[in-house]
Amino acid sequence: MGTAKCFIAANFFRRNFMVRERIPACTGAAGLLYYNKTRAHRQMPLPTEYCRKGVPDAPRPADTAMSKCILVINPGSTSTKIAVFRGAEKVFDETLRHSREELAPFHWVMEQVDFRRAVIERALAAHDFDTAQLDGICARGGQLPPCESGTYLVEQRMADYMYTIKHAAHASNLGCVLALELAQPLHIPAFICDPVSVDEMTEEARITGLPEIRRTMLGHALNCRAMARRCAEEVLHKPLEDCRLIVLHLGGGASARLFIGGKMVDGVRDDEWMFAPERFGGASLQPVVRLCYSGKYTEKEMTDFIRGKGGLVAYLGTADAREVEKRIADGDAQAKLIYDGMLYSAARAIGGLAAAADGQVDRVILTGGIAHSKYVAAYLTKKLSFIAPVEIMPGEFELEALAAGACRVLEGQERPKHFALPTAQA
């Protein structure tokens, strides 16, 4: 990495980890709910170590603000990504891949908890890493009810809630349970950061024309917010709260978020206005209703089209954008039509968010794995540059974002948030 980039990266993390407000000391009476495999609920007092490691009892000097050791966990459908950070520095990372044969015995994603925890423990042992060094664990957050952005302390009720999600349960639901089970014997706090269900949408944006259905957010909140924060710090050189940004994440799925005043005030879900390599979206409703009642497909099959078997998979038989671009380079006109159609649908969605921002947008940010493609960058830059300059920030920085979120809490820059059940379920 060049000197300039090193300086920018260091500056970014220094600003994000600086202590800004004191968080009161925790007390043993508060208690910490733990989860065990029998799911027999019990409350254990907060150990002294938790107060020492978990929540600072006094502001830290700025020169110690990057010393916390964090294990981060990002569970996906066929892999679990882990990394250990000491402040902003990544000590090591690894993608633990799970074969179809390994996952075959599990009929529901939450049945994989013991399997994935064992895989993580073996990987840490293989790196000869002493978990006693850890100050906290932060995992990708799952399908919680709509919530604010931020870093959440993982408590028993959050882990329990993941077990109530039976329909279309996502692998991210494993994150908080894995973090809590690994943190329990170490007496350190477990966190999640910017879960997929972050929803700060304005009320007028929720109206659909049918009272029974309100728009909600769902998508790549963690990476979108990380890229928005990074663009604000490194490109615009001002706080995220002072920026107006649109972030488009393009991966196996696609979603977009509009940031105003530091909040995600509107967005496009991965099942809404655009389609993606594995997602169906952007269709008129009447044909969808007719297909649902045609008798041709079950509810599960229709749901699979929305996430998993739609998009490029349905048209071209593959979700691999690199393969599709190779077909285009080889003269496959159908592949070009479908691929361009996917990018067109994304550009159209971004245009809608720009209108929601009154046309006042500082940057449009392209991120996710597909943003590595020069073809994609050129197509979308041409379509979107009339709105605002387009920043290409490819890849995913979810591991870094998880570590940064935990550090901001552990160093006293932010207060941890607490999960609350929806009123109807409390």
Task: Tell me the role of every PLM-derived stretch.
Residues 361-380:
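Glycine-rich phosphate-binding loops at beta-strand->alpha-helix junctions
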Residues 94-132, 156-158, 162-167:
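N-terminal phosphate-binding loop and adjacent alpha-helix
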Residues 70-111, 270:
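Short glycine-rich, Thr/Ser-proximal phosphate-binding strand/loop in the N-terminal lobe
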Residues 124-171, 189, 197-209:
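Short beta-strand-loop/turn "lid" adjacent to the catalytic site in phosphate-handling enzymes
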Residues 174-181, 192, 207, 212-244, ...:
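Glycine-rich phosphate-binding loop plus the immediately following alpha-helix
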